[in-house]
């Protein structure tokens, strides 16, 4: 009798589950629904970063002379940071030559308005169109040190007409690592939302070796997933991915930015 009761209870439970699945359960989550769900959860008010500019190409020497700069140097690299846009756009390796037959040092980064423009920018964006934020044309001011070394960081600031100050502290280790700390000082009586960003800008695709065990192109680790995108792949189709943590860069035969 107990066995019959157990079987009857199981059968009744199964019937209830089946009926609920048919009439009350939500539809299965498709890829399209999942994408829309993620979009809603992340919010649609986050601003996008779009600072595409048409620039007239000039020589490296002329480009470097067009804006005031902060010089940096340690035992491994030498270069400068442009106060226009606070861009790291001038970097030369002190210990690496272009070739075995040349004394010319390898130049990795170059100003935006050169043929091989290659630079690093960081800053903030906001959804409030009435707030002025620093962009690639903004002129930053320095305070304290005006030369960056592995022993002395530099501080930059830019203040808009609304009374909001944007600050950067840039430090350098004894090799190749820059660290940028950013903060905002809001002297107004209003609250604003800002989103920090960092980006690497490269004007053109460099010469690549096409060696099958070597990746040259975009490189990232996002949410613990390694991602490698070749230059030709992103020319054919744009690549986009959302993550909560990670890092990204551009890899060449010998260097990673």
Indicate where each model-derived feature is located:
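Generic N-terminal leader/processing signal
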Residues: 2, 35-37, 127, 166
């Amino acid at each position: 009798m107990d066995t019959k009761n157990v079987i009857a209870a199981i059968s009744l439970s199964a019937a209830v589950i089946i009926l609920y699945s048919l009439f009350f359960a939500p539809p299965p989550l498709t890829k399209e629904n999942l994408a829309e769900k993620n979009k809603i959860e992340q919010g649609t008010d986050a601003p996008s970063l779009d600072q595409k500019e048409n620039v007239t190409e000039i020589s490296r020497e002329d480009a470097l002379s067009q804006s005031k700069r902060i010089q940096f140097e340690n035992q491994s690299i030498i270069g400068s940071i442009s106060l226009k846009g606070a861009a790291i756009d001038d970097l030369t390796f002190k210990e690496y030559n272009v070739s075995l037959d040349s004394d010319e040092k390898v130049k990795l980064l170059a100003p935006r308005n050169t043929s091989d423009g290659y630079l690093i920018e960081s800053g903030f964006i906001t959804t409030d169109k009435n707030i002025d934020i620093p962009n690639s044309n903004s002129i930053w001011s320095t305070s304290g040190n005006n030369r960056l070394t592995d022993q002395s960081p530099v501080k930059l600031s830019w203040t808009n007409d609304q009374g909001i100050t944007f600050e950067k502290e840039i430090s350098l280790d004894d090799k190749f690592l820059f660290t940028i700390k950013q903060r905002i000082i809001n002297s107004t009586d209003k609250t604003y939302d800002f989103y920090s960003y960092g980006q690497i800008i490269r004007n053109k695709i460099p010469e690549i070796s096409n060696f099958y065990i070597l990746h040259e192109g975009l490189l990232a680790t996002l949410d613990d997933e390694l991602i490698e995108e070749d230059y030709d792949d992103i020319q054919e189709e744009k690549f986009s991915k959302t993550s909560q943590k990670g890092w990204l860069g551009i890899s060449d035969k010998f260097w990673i930015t």
